[in-house]
C-alpha cells in the first residue's frame, strides 16, 4: 500500500496543548483535574510520553473527546514515526548506492 507520508509525525501532545489554549486552561489545572503530576503532563505535551489507555480515558472525561480518538492519534503518531524512519533508511541506502556508483567510474 502506498501511503502518503507526512513531513513529520504529530504527537497527540500537540493536540492536548491546542485544547488547553482553546479552553484557556493551564497545564497545572489539567494536571490537577487528571490527578497527575504537572511534570507528567508536560512530558506528554512535549511528546516525551505516549498516550496510553488510562490517559486517554482521563482526557475523554475532561475534554469530552473520545478515548478512542486519543488512542488513534497515538497509534497514527507511532505508525508515522516508523514510516519516516523506514523512508530515511531507504534514502540513505539509495544515497550510498549512488555514492559507490560514482566511485566505480
Segments predicted by a language model, with ranges:
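A short, Lys/Arg-rich alpha-helix, primarily the initiator
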Residues: 1-25, 72
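Short juxta-domain linker segments that transition from a proline/glycine-rich
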Residues: 10, 21, 78-105
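Residues within the helices of the helix-turn-helix
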Residues: 17, 28, 57
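Short alpha-helical DNA-recognition segment
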Residues: 25-43
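Short, basic-rich loop-to-helix N-cap that marks the start of a DNA-contacting helix
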Residues: 48-62
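Short C-terminal boundary/hinge segments that cap the last helix of small helical domains
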Residues: 65-83
Amino acid at each position: 500500500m502506498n501511503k502518503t507520508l507526512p513531513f513529520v509525525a504529530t504527537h497527540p501532545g500537540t493536540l492536548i496543548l491546542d485544547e488547553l489554549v482553546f479552553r484557556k486552561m493551564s497545564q497545572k489545572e489539567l494536571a490537577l483535574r487528571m490527578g497527575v503530576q504537572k511534570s507528567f503532563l508536560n512530558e506528554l505535551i512535549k511528546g516525551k510520553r505516549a498516550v496510553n489507555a488510562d490517559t486517554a480515558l482521563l482526557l475523554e472525561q475532561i475534554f469530552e473527546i473520545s478515548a478512542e480518538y486519543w488512542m488513534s492519534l497515538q497509534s497514527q503518531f507511532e505508525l508515522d514515526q516508523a514510516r519516516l524512519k523506514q523512508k530515511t533508511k531507504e534514502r540513505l541506502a539509495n544515497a550510498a548506492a549512488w555514492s559507490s556508483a560514482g566511485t566505480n567510474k
